[in-house]
Amino acid sequence: MNKFIFKKPISSLEDRIKKTPKDNPKRGHWTNERGLSMYVPVDSQTEIIALLKTFNLKGINYIEAMADFRNCSLNTVYLEHMSILRYINFSECDRLCADHWNTINYLNCSTWTRSKVRKYRKSHSLSWHERNDRTTCDLVPTKINAFFLHLGGIAECKYAYKYINK
């Protein structure tokens, strides 16, 4: 039995679309409808374009106004209890990542710890992206996570908290 519950977003599609990037001649454009297609950076966004190219990507797809970072994720972990506090989530993600990397001998190392993952994450400019399902977290380049605006997992947890405490 799967102990993880992948929850539908509590936020509305409209709320999520409001948090996605707008078409902007200095930033990027949508390939189709905002929040329901790919957001592509303009040519002058050379740093983001270079990062995307390392993953063979031209932009980031949004599914129902949720950024889909799976194609630029170095690792994916699943939290039993996502928090509204990012540092709590990141600490647990680092621990789970260490467990996984030890099993696959990532970078020829089988002595990963939460602390080592945290140091690696910081030295390689990586962040955990909390998905809207309030369970899944992807390890992605921080600049990609920041550039492709979105309403993410912590916001969903805050929506859930408000809903429960009504």
Residue ranges and their predicted role:
Residues 1-127, 131-166:
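Nuclease and nuclease-like effector domains acting on nucleic acids or nucleotide cofactors
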